[in-house]
């Protein structure tokens, strides 16, 4: 979007036509409200940017099908020129005509017709240039089908539009609709407006609507429309004095038969504009992020760098995009409905005044005044930015232009910076509503994303603090590493040819997050269908499983006007977090995933794990929808956004920690109930505090050794050429345990049956060495470096017999031989190291032996005794022998 500059923001409101509540559609579902349909169609209008068009910003839905549209606005319009009742100069008329045609031509390229062209919808900016307003009303209302008022103004409607009339459907049954207006209807409207400017007066003012319509239709019987109009309004002398090129424009615009009338594109190329057209440079839309074109191709720097700032005064807010300004306006307390009420655009009527005078037994009523609220009041109310500017008055200019390269520690910090640092410690819900904080975060992320992928590392760093909601869609794409010609790739996929999956997709979409106005709109359904189908077609080795629609929902919502980016994000997300989950036979993948999840429950909450296992409430009964949809099936979108903000920063094992965190929030209820009650509890999941869930899942993730969540069916490591780039940009906690380099100390795959038989997870020798802070000799490497002063995070319990232990053991480990470790009742036998084991309860306990079955049994006993964070060394003591890290106790003399 363009910067706000000298423009303002305006809002206008109208009602969509209401539908009966007792009528269903052909699919048996209730009819989609017309306001929802309009809201869905409106979204594409936000992407249409041109210097001759007022930028659409937002649409909000109120009660009783009310819609409020926010768009760029200018106070002056051609209506003001006509009020002066003076003919406009010929050169000005030519410039106005050409600029209007520029806007209309750009709209036509995007398949949009204005249809509501009139002097008060042709605005003038501070420099006197044209901006077309309300050009999307005809498009968003489905050519007027979804509202009870006509689109357009009788004096300016083309004859072919008037001839079709305004049909109304009865009982909401589709009838034969008139053909939608084409680009040529706008050319007629422009002709009438130019005629009015030339003569300095408005036409048809003395005629009522029916007479105007009749007069316009009779123009088809005359030879010269211009002369007839001039004679009718007593301005023939003025018309005769017009230069030939202006007369030619008027004649071409006011050609009665549309087949002979030029389109805006044809008229722009006409010889009459030969002197005007060189004054204007063709508009080239700037390349957006993730576009295939080179973003810096048209970048030119002036010789004097100060020239960049010559047009910038102290109004830094005006340099931000109109979308950002509106978002901040809302945060600063802006209320659209309140603004419209203050200007008396919205008037409340006492209910008693709406009662009929007579009411018969059959329900027929009489004496009710006509409700005129359903008609269009196209008054645009200017939204005051005073409250926002007052809120941001203490924000310095440097906040609008953050330095990304300089060392911030050497720069002086203002009070504003100190306040921001304090704000960063506040709860996320408060930060997201803090105007000043969001301004700084939006500007910072905007700068970083413009430098993507060069600034990928810094995007990761800032995303760990928080992600501003306005920048979430692009930030997620950056975190997922989306790059390349995503639009060309998406466009090349066949999304039209019928496939067997179509039927299931059609069934699932109307059930997917339909509480959301955007996703429940017909436009949302169509986009859902295309993105899902594109994914299915482009992944022939995978299949569509129910739940894929829920997985698609967050990406589609954030990138509603960019299906290619939604598809690219989804295609990058699934291999990372749900690798092979969508195979036709995915049982082995799901079973391994759920087994590892069971081990994670036992690792972090043994008491809960013991209880769930005793009552037979296994993850297969409740967790498959969690992980298959990455929680999008169980949480609403606003919770998913905060959850995924953190999920995307972690590796593929982070979902396990989210799952455990959810169970821990329900812990008391689960421990107090049996199998049937737990089933009922999960059939309608109780309210989950998502901020607490995120916080606890991060804590669980930090306590989990990386290799404890190893899965043989996880995404295989990328080739060395790619992985080196990924490793250099991704933080340690987002790296996978399977990432290279793979050594002899890494975890090995084991059969699923063996994995299921073990209650506690295995960790690799690599992780053990890392957590014990041991020094490795030879060619072995550890993934991280720890300081020598830090306390050990774990206790190694060696369960071999004492003779083997004396021959060589891990430094700092304790010996509890398996044969004498537990009593007949299953309690831990008292011994010299029992107290030490008890003191380490709560820290990581690694069970080491040389017989895998014994180590698994020992770990299971500890879990039964409610010892948390118990795990097994993969490969046993034999994995450690080649490292030279085993120590032998000094002989006692």
Curated annotation (Swiss-Prot):
Component of the FERRY complex (Five-subunit Endosomal Rab5 and RNA/ribosome intermediary). The FERRY complex directly interacts with mRNAs and RAB5A, and functions as a RAB5A effector involved in the localization and the distribution of specific mRNAs most likely by mediating their endosomal transport. The complex recruits mRNAs and ribosomes to early endosomes through direct mRNA-interaction. Also involved in the modulation of mTOR signaling and expression of mTOR complex components. Involved in the control of actin-cytoskeleton organization. SUPFAM superfamilies: Protein kinase-like (PK-like) (SSF56112), Rhodanese/Cell cycle control phosphatase (SSF52821), Ypt/Rab-GAP domain of gyp1p (SSF47923). InterPro entries: Kinase-like_dom_sf, Prot_kinase_dom, Rab-GAP-TBC_dom, Rab-GAP_TBC_sf, Rhodanese-like_dom, Rhodanese-like_dom_sf. Belongs to the protein kinase superfamily. Residues 1-273 form the Protein kinase domain. The gene is Tbck. The keyword Cytoplasm applies. PROSITE patterns: PROTEIN_KINASE_DOM (PS50011), TBC_RABGAP (PS50086). It holds the Pfam family Rhodanese. Residues 466-651 form the Rab-GAP TBC domain. This is TBC domain-containing protein kinase-like protein. The keyword Transmembrane helix does not apply. GO terms for cellular component: early endosome; midbody; mitotic spindle. Keywords: Cytoplasm, Cytoskeleton, Endosome. It comes from Mus musculus. It is found in: Cytoplasm; Cytoplasm, Cytoskeleton, Spindle; Midbody; Early endosome. It comes from the Eukaryota.
